Amino acid sequence: MAVVAVAGGTGGKGVPGAANEPRRYAVDYDNVEEMRNVLKENNVEVVVSALLLSDESVAKSQINLIRAAAESGTVTKFIPSEYYIDFHSPIPGSDLFTNFQIEAEEELMRHPQLTWTLIRVGIFLDHLTMPFNPKPTYITPYWVFVDIEHEECVFPGDGSQPLVLSHSTDLAAYIECLVGLPSNEWPRESLVASNKIQVKDLQDLIKKTTGTLCGHLGICIRTFLILAIGREFKVTYDSVESIQKGQITPLTSNRPVFDDPQKGKLFQEVEVQVMLSMLSNAHDLPGKNLAELFPEVHVTNIEDFLRAGWEMKQGLKP
């Protein structure tokens, strides 16, 4: 069994399901030698980075981690923190995170002893039902497109853009499979695409999965019909012009997120980047679909997930 090190694995997208409690090490990400020794002494073979590349300091930490892995003599596989879109795709009006991701890719190319893959996931499905989570999640609370609590949606343009949605547990399952795959079979670009839709499809999915059952008696034909009446969410389509100006209708649940004095500005920048990336069709994701390599993985169906989230909301109502 391979020894795997997860950098940043105590929160966010990096928490795997494991039968045994993993060992934890506090390391100085500015000290390549220290990290190299920790990796070597523990015979680590695979490094999975779950660092949130939110600024230059964290991006530099991942660069140092790559160098430590390359110098360890034990690490042969590396998965950088990507888990979103192809950062080579141009997104007019936003370069948020782009340089950090490309710098990591360039650093990996300098170390031929490492096998690596860039994993594209799109938007995490986890965001769509928060704070009602049908499956375990460690994703930071933040709302994208749908606010199930306040029954509202905000979509970009006409909503016709391609969208990939996968749950964080789907990503974890595929990473576990990749760890066991021989290095020569690793794709350079990997795709986790549990659900492929257009953004505007979310409106119909919401209506379909928030249905409440009611009976209707047909007097003439003497039949009893069970109808599902879906909830009508408030839906806003932000215009292309507004998005390009950074004027995006905030989902109600995001308002306190944006008001946070430490992270609010970053999340507002993320919101703009997500909407601009949708307009440029950057979510038409490339890569080898891991569902083809690992058909045994049971991924999260968006319809089932939304329905379960809605049912949790109904059950938690006072």
UniProtKB/Swiss-Prot annotation:
InterPro entries: NAD(P)-bd_dom_sf, NmrA/Isoflavone_reductase-like. GO terms for molecular function: oxidoreductase activity. It is an enzyme of class 1 (oxidoreductase). Pathway: Mycotoxin biosynthesis. Its EC number is 1.3.1.-. Keywords: NADP, Oxidoreductase. Belongs to the NmrA-type oxidoreductase family. Isoflavone reductase subfamily. Aminotransferase; part of the gene cluster that mediates the biosynthesis of swainsonine (SW), a cytotoxic fungal alkaloid and a potential cancer therapy drug. Swainsonine production occurs via a multibranched pathway and is dispensable for fungal colonization of plants and infection of insect hosts. The first step of swainsonine biosynthesis is the production of the precursor pipecolic acid (PA) via conversion of L-lysine (Lys) to 1-piperideine-6-carboxylate (P6C) by the aminotransferase swnA, the latter being further reduced to PA by the reductase swnR. This is Oxidoreductase swnN. It comes from Arthroderma benhamiae (strain ATCC MYA-4681 / CBS 112371).
